[in-house]
Amino acid sequence: MKRTKNINRETFRKSWRDYRVAPVALAISAVFMLAGCEKSDETVSMYQNADDCSRTNPSMSEQCTTAYNNALKEAEKTAPKYATREDCVAEFGEAQCTQAPAPAQAGMAAESQSSGSMWMPLMAGYMMGRMMGGSGFAQQPLFTSKNAASPANGKFVDASGKSYGPATAGGRTMTVPKTAMAPKPAVTNTVTRGGFGESVAKQTSMQRSSATSSSRSMGG
């Protein structure tokens, strides 16, 4: 009888150790799986307007227009804002700026409205990609500068100042991090002249550093 008790105790201890190890192993696996998902990129297309999108995708004319209109609404909320037209023109160039709508009209809280009018760059294009699960499309407004001295000159940049290459027509496709399509915060305060250009320059420098680091890692 004593021997039987010893055997049962050993079996129980072994089972308990296995039971404790299994959840830990599963948890570690889950963390790695989530990390992999978070780092995964997605393919998006960039267009100057709805017609540009429709010409490239004749069967998606309705989706092109919907995404374009949604991007325009986002641009009203998230584009950099300037206290004067001159400040905006100095950053983006002549005929590239428009008066920003009042916060309430742009879908923001009325109490956040600053006194006086603000100016913002015109939307120069938009980024369009599949939403998670494939149900519909997500979009982000893109801007560009016609000022040769600006870091954003001739490039598509988003509201945060991140660059996505030449602002060309014809539907350019590229791979971007999932964060690129994440909603951007509404902008209710003005930026100083040249401030957005500094953000673009900083983001471009970070992108180059990241690309260099990735290249070195892959090279061994």
From Swiss-Prot:
InterPro entries: Biofilm_formation_YgiB. Pfam families: DUF1190. Residues 181-220 are annotated as: Disordered. Signal peptide: none annotated. Belongs to the UPF0441 family. Residues 203-220 have a biased composition (Low complexity). It comes from the Bacteria. This is UPF0441 protein Spro_4274.
